From Swiss-Prot:
The keyword Secreted applies. One of its GO terms (biological process) is blood vessel diameter maintenance. This is Neurotensin. Keywords: Pyrrolidone carboxylic acid, Secreted, Vasoactive. It comes from the Eukaryota. It is found in: Secreted. Smooth muscle-contracting peptide. Peptide action is not affected by tetrodotoxin, but is slightly mediated through the release of acetylcholine. The modification Pyrrolidone carboxylic acid is found at Q1. GO terms for cellular component: extracellular region. It comes from Rhinella marina (Cane toad). Its main location: secreted.
Length: 13
């Protein structure tokens, strides 16, 4: 599941 933080940094949980 790809999530994008408020800093626009994509990371996978």
């Amino acid at each position: 599941q790809a999530i994008v933080s408020k800093a626009r940094r994509p990371y996978i949980l």
